[in-house]
């Protein structure tokens, strides 16, 4: 049995729910789900260029967990882009 998911601090808002290849209906595509914490890790680590230690502290998780989330997110994005799959983005409620 796996451990229960820890509540994590998520700060960004996702502008879209689906990212897919142009010209192909989403019903014809395989879909990969990007989880909210993976999206946040990708945003903090790659877009905002935060160190893993700082980003992990902001999310309230360990640096190792942050590294796992970032690696998982990168793999999912790379798979979707290189294999022409749809990427389902998480719906994160805006806290404003």
UniProtKB/Swiss-Prot annotation:
It holds the Pfam family DUF134. Signal peptide: none annotated. It comes from the Bacteria. InterPro entries: UPF0251 (IPR002852), WH-like_DNA-bd_sf (IPR036388). Transmembrane segments: none annotated. Belongs to the UPF0251 family. PANTHER family: PTHR37478, UPF0251 PROTEIN TK0562 (PTHR37478:SF2). This is UPF0251 protein Spea_3639. The lineage of its organism: Bacteria, Pseudomonadati, Pseudomonadota, Gammaproteobacteria, Alteromonadales.
